[in-house]
Amino acid sequence: DRVNRKWLVVGSLFVWSGVTYLMGYADNFHELYWLRAVMGVSEALYIPSALSLIADWHQGKSRSLAIGVHMTGLYVGQAIGGFGATVAAIFSWHTTFHWFGIVGMIYSVVLIFLLRENPDRMIAEQPSSAAGKEKRPSLFGGLSMLFSTWAFWIILFYFAAPSLPGWATKNWLPTLFSESLDIPMAEAGPISTITIAFSSFVGVILGGILSDRWVQKNIRGRVYTGAIGLGLTVPALMLLGFGSSFVAVIGAGLLFGIGFGIFDANNMPILCQFVSAKHRGTAYGIMNMTGVFAGAAVTQLLGKWTDGGSLGEGFAMLSIIVLIALALQLYFLRPKTDNME
């Protein structure tokens, strides 16, 4: 929110790609551990900057679709990552890390020439008078504004609650597929990853198109679209938890992915209805941090449930939290505009 977002995007991509390259030289766990920590910081710099930049370039009729198209990159990356072990088996894991890192660093250089900051933002960053400079929002002033807005607290919970099953599927779905379908992990990993990635890809595109059209007729269209996505994840989590046949489990995975994709495409557009452009990066950064913390907690919790043989029940119980978030969202989120200034 305070510096040029183009250079945050380019810099973070270069750093995490460089870290990926260096991982190929790691000799022990501690080296991987600290390199992964640096990667986490650089990745955290990226997502608020990128989504804020996209939201500024795409307003009204194309915002949700643009965010959705961007999110497809994450899902494609996850799907490709599902074959990381296969690639490593062919070329060695050292070479795999090296080349993924090299590709990322080259692409960051390409972005220097192709990525542009929004012109309106650049004008705002160059006030014509000393008085204009004084109006630049302070860090703590922005945080104070966000946390004093009740709608932001609702959005924060609305974002964090689905992050629990979202991270649960990323980290534990292969194990659940392996146990429920009685198949080896070597098969369960790619099946679960591709199932979620493909269906989420479909979900973000559908959710983006539906939201952009609905909001033209009803200002709560984005809220309703996000609610549809969350609603789809509830039966999906129940089926994932208690399903035992191939059709039930795979079908549940597809349903969850579509629902989560619809939800994912509308987070930033909904935020734009309640938070001004000056604070959107900060707001999404806080949301992303909260979601990751929730994911870390549920990953550890599901690990304990797995040891106790209750992984399926754990997935099903997560649907309760999603239902609470869904109810709060529909009752409290009543935007007055599609683009808060």
Model-predicted segments: where are they?
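Cytoplasmic helix-loop-helix junction between adjacent transmembrane helices
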Residues: 35-73
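Primarily marks hydrophobic transmembrane alpha-helices of the MFS/SLC 12-helix fold
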Residues: 9, 32, 220-226
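Helix-breaking motifs and short loop linkers at transmembrane-helix boundaries and internal kinks
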Residues: 4, 25-31, 59, 243-244
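Conserved MFS/SLC helix-loop-helix module at the cytosolic interface between two early adjacent transmembrane helices
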Residues: 1-27
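Extracytoplasmic gate region of multi-pass secondary transporters
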Residues: 144-205, 264, 268, 299
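Helix-loop-helix hairpin linking two adjacent transmembrane segments in secondary transporters
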Residues: 70, 74-119
